[in-house]
Amino acid sequence: MALSQKEQDIQMMLAAQCHLGTKNCHYQMERYMYRRRQDGIYIINLEKTYEKLQMAARIIVAIENPQDICVLSARPYGQRAVFKFAQYLGCKSMAGRHTPGTFTNQIQKAFEEPRLLILTDPRTDHQPVKESSYMNIPTIAFCDTDSPLTHVDVAIPANNKGKHSIGVLYFLLARMVLEMRDQINVTNPWSVPVDLFFYREPEEAKEAGEEETFEAEGYALPAPVGAAENWGEAAAPAPEAAGYDGAAAAGGFEAAAGFEAAAPPVAGYVAPEAFGGAF
């Protein structure tokens, strides 16, 4: 028997471990828990997660202009998912560190005034959550078992720390929004794979044989004087400087170094012997 769309989505969330929480549980998140394992890990009820995803999709569809929706993620695992979500829905994305005052300081160059805020983790993105409360901006957030729900209007219970779980959650939310907008349906399905929403590791270092080579000019050491192509041949001696007399130079140096050849003492000079020979 073929599974319904809801059952398929829940199976996908199970495979991505969206149901695994942490060993701590916030008292406001207890309503979304299914049970607690023997090792202390809380299990999230994915039925309620699916219901909250549909609720969040209805809120997103209610915004006429998608540019009034802002999606944020300070976690590295959610940054690629945020970019893809914004690409397919036409909303704004902010990945990485949130600049304080983006929603409150109108003098700031990067000032934004969204009508809806979507967050990956309310604990990591605590600064935009706080600013949204000042500006009365509705907030949707993916909340883990230990996430605080202060100033969060719609909490979607799920694992927001895994790279696969975050990608699946944003994928399902984007697909639900497109279905409600009637941009995709049974006859015109969404052909985007969920893998595009997953975090990807940085490219590995190149192999030793593929190291970059630089031009010799400007980077190589200068050739030694008199160096020959054949290393077995001796280099020609350097020519002596014309008119150079090493003995005279040495003699002049010795004469100048003597105490007798030094300049006479300045007037008013008192010899050390006048003080007993020592200070």
From Swiss-Prot:
One of its GO terms (molecular function) is structural constituent of ribosome. One of its GO terms (biological process) is translation. The keyword Ribonucleoprotein applies. It is found in: Cytoplasm. Gene3D superfamilies: Glucose-6-phosphate isomerase like protein, domain 1. It comes from the Eukaryota. Keywords: Cytoplasm, Ribonucleoprotein, Ribosomal protein. Its main location: cytoplasm. One of its GO terms (cellular component) is cytosolic small ribosomal subunit. InterPro entries: Ribosomal_uS2, Ribosomal_uS2_CS, Ribosomal_uS2_euk, Ribosomal_uS2_euk/arc, Ribosomal_uS2_flav_dom_sf. Component of the small ribosomal subunit. Mature ribosomes consist of a small (40S) and a large (60S) subunit. The 40S subunit contains about 33 different proteins and 1 molecule of RNA (18S). The 60S subunit contains about 49 different proteins and 3 molecules of RNA (25S, 5.8S and 5S). Interacts with ribosomal protein S21. Belongs to the universal ribosomal protein uS2 family. Required for the assembly and/or stability of the 40S ribosomal subunit. Required for the processing of the 20S rRNA-precursor to mature 18S rRNA in a late step of the maturation of 40S ribosomal subunits. This is Small ribosomal subunit protein uS2. It comes from Chlamydomonas reinhardtii (Chlamydomonas smithii).
